[in-house]
């Protein structure tokens, strides 16, 4: 099991990070952490300490200009009513070769695993394409930063993968799933996905409005966001919506 995990997350050969939760939660409900860079190779022994719950580690995907895995980091605007289910459903519906894993902060890491080393630029291009289409997350790896590894304290972990039905997976089942979704470089380059249309005229919405619809409203900007939505809805009817209709749309969008 350890060898399979080390092989799956092979990355920067010269350094790794350790992370520790502070016990504090920010205004969004995200668990905060401290990070320390260790300038030495990540050994199987250190991986074992991670699995045993002694040291939480993170790995940078890049090995020079190549990588064997990448990650879309879903960090929701608010964690209060957050659920991974819609992201898991998107992965299943559009047959994306991604493995969803709960992150230490309570969000979601969507991992892509490759059979061979691939160009960092090419992997980022594909992940950015999927992110822009389906997820609109703020961070996509590789990006010269480390990703905290899953299955810390693996026998009692809270950082686990999900299957297609959003059920948590033990580490052995995660490894089976991740290895089954591994792509060759050629398969990655040739992979096509269907257009994402969660509602009518989705492709005509500007990216900022798409983001606001798919993610809960940040409280400080809610009114501005609702205003942008209503402007768009009014344009769709050539300005024929009355005040009552706009109010009803605002109430529905604000749920």
Regions found by a protein language model. Name each.
Residues 72, 88-90, 94-97, 194-196:
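Catalytic residues for metal-mediated phosphoryl-transfer on nucleic acids/nucleotides
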Residues 80-93, 113-138, 155-173:
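Helical (often loop-to-helix) elements that flank the catalytic cores of nucleotide-handling enzymes
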Residues 5, 134-196:
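Catalytic "initiation/cleavage/transfer" segments centered on a nucleophilic residue
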Residues 63-73, 103-113, 146, 226-227:
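Glycine-rich, often proline-containing surface loops adjacent to acidic residues and nearby aromatics
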Residues 59-62, 98-105, 138-142:
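Short beta-strand
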Residues 77, 107-108, 112-126, 153, ...:
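Modules that initiate DNA replication and primer synthesis
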Residues 51-58, 91-98, 215:
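Short amphipathic beta-strand starts and helix->beta connectors
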Residues 1-69, 77-87, 145-147, 151-154:
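DNA replication initiation on ssDNA origins
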């Amino acid at each position: 099991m350890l060898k399979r995990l080390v092989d799956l997350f092979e990355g920067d050969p010269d350094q790794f990070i350790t992370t520790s939760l502070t016990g504090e939660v920010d205004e969004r409900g995200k668990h905060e952490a401290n990070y320390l860079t260790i300038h030495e190779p990540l050994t199987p022994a250190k991986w074992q300490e991670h699995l045993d719950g002694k040291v939480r580690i993170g790995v940078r995907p890049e090995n020079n200009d190549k990588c064997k895995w990448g990650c879309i980091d879903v960090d929701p605007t608010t964690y209060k009513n957050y659920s991974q289910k819609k992201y898991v459903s998107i992965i299943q519906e559009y047959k994306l070769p991604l493995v969803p894993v709960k992150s230490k902060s309570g969000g979601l890491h969507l991992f892509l695993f490759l059979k061979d080393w691939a160009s960092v630029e090419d992997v980022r291009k594909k992940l950015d394409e999927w992110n822009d289409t389906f997820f609109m997350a703020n961070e996509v790896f590789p990006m010269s930063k480390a990703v905290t590894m899953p299955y810390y304290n693996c026998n009692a972990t809270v950082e686990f993968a999900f299957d297609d039905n959003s059920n948590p997976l033990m580490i052995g089942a995660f490894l089976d799933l991740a290895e089954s979704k591994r792509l060759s470089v050629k398969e990655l380059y040739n992979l096509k996905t269907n257009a994402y249309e969660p509602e009518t005229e989705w492709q005509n919405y500007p990216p900022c409005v798409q983001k606001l619809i798919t993610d809960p409203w940040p409280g400080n900007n809610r009114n501005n966001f609702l205003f942008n939505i209503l402007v768009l809805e009014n344009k769709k009817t050539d300005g024929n919506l009355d005040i009552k209709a706009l109010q009803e749309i605002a109430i529905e969008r604000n749920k």
